[in-house]
A protein has these predicted regions:
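Bacterial Sec-dependent N-terminal signal peptides
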Residues: 1-27
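Beta-sheet-dominated interaction scaffolds and their linkers
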Residues: 276-305
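Short beta-strand edge segments in extracellular beta-sheet folds
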Residues: 373-377
Length: 377
């Protein structure tokens, strides 16, 4: 049987297996920092022309101007102070890794500033992380490479956008109204896989309040990817394919956008993922929990099988961002015989009678044969 949320990959070469971390064991899960907290010596910068005005390669104020270009930042769009990277957003562009990456787990911590710039000074603050980036720096709107995007936008961190990097498969609920009254297809793992060329809205809003730091993650696994916000899976895509090249897209550089909004990063780090599988057997002390805004429920989960590394949780159903579950620091290794207890409640005003499915995530996808139902009261 095919499970779209977990593609099993067997590596036959032992030398390849040994080059990755095993998520089924307690391993040295060392992260490599991509941002050293001092400068951008590990990055390239690119900025387009100062008088370009929006999502057009031709829309300019006045006569055409050349781009500011590569590793030239006269307006200090990208600056580092006290271990924090500031991206002003004043000119569209990006910082770009010098290396390409594939089969990785990316983690970054960000928060919004106050400043916004034309042409998006009246719109929600916006940025993004582009992955599997290839080609010229100025492919899209004279400022970004061919890529796929994990959107970083107020209230919508974890949206997917296609920036010319190929077409992927998604599970979506069609024509949903977003928080900004737009119409978009929304990630919904209860739906069948379809090939989708454009935007896919995140499943729920798990961001921190403005002014606080949000931890976002991406697992890029071959031609698939998973987006995670503050410990919760919010989007998932499969089989990224470039028709013009007749091949899957599995690796590339990373870009962090400047797109009209001031924002900050205090951590950007990456680690390789492991394809070594374990056989955990996770059992909850109840199959269903009734959640109330008046008191916490305690979700108790015991591992009766092999050790497994958990990187996130996922909620499936309606109003999932009204369910409040306190997760432990991730990633965490759940050993055989050990258990975790997760306090769970709901926000005031949540619609009663909703059934929300809860499951746990590894770098290879959801833990097999484990899910529980949460019923709102």
């Amino acid at each position: 049987m095919r499970f779209p949320f977990l593609r099993i990959v067997v590596l036959l070469l032992v030398t390849c297996v040994m080059s990755f971390f095993s998520f089924g064991q307690k391993t040295n899960n060392t992260w490599k920092s991509l941002f050293n907290g001092r400068d951008l010596s590990n990055w390239d910068t690119w900025l387009r022309a100062t008088n370009m005005t929006g999502y057009s390669d031709d829309e300019m104020i006045g006569p055409p101007q050349p781009p500011i270009g590569l590793n030239n930042d006269p307006l200090n769009v990208f600056t580092v102070k006290d271990g924090i990277l500031r991206i002003s957003g004043e000119i569209w562009g990006a910082i770009t890794t010098k290396e390409e990456y594939g089969n990785y787990h990316l983690r970054f911590v960000t928060k919004w500033g106050d400043k916004k710039y034309f042409p998006k000074d009246t719109l929600p603050r916006d940025a993004g992380v582009l992955f599997h980036c290839t080609g010229n720096f100025d492919y899209a709107f004279k400022c970004w490479m061919r890529s796929m995007e994990m959107q970083i936008q107020e209230g919508e961190i974890g949206d997917f956008f296609n920036v010319g990097g190929g077409v992927a498969e998604f599970q979506v609920k069609e024509k949903v109204k977003t928080i900004y009254n737009e119409t978009a297809d929304q990630y919904d793992p209860s739906q069948p896989l379809v090939r989708h060329p454009g935007r896919v809205w995140r499943s729920g809003n798990f961001e921190s309040p403005k002014g606080e730091w949000t931890t976002s993650e991406m697992v890029a696994r071959h031609a698939d990817a998973v987006f995670i916000v503050n410990g919760f899976v919010v989007n998932r895509l499969f089989n990224i394919f470039r028709k013009d090249l007749n091949e899957q897209v599995t690796r590339g550089k990373l870009q962090f956008q400047s797109e009209s909004a001031e924002h900050f990063y205090k951590k950007i780090e990456i680690r390789p993922i492991s394809f070594v599988q374990s056989r955990p057997v996770l059992v909850a002390n109840q199959k269903e929990y009734t959640l109330s805004a008046l008191q916490n429920q305690q979700i108790e989960i015991t591992n009766k099988g092999e050790a497994v590394e958990i990187i996130a949780a996922e909620l499936i159903g309606k109003e999932i961002d009204s369910v409040v579950i306190k997760l432990p620091p991730m990633p965490m290794v759940l050993k055989k015989g050990s258990k975790i207890v997760l306090p769970a409640t709901i926000k005031q005003g949540t619609t009663p009678g909703n059934v929300v499915t809860f499951r746990l995530e590894t770098v290879l996808g959801p833990v097999s044969d484990f899910q529980i139902n949460l019923i709102t009261k």
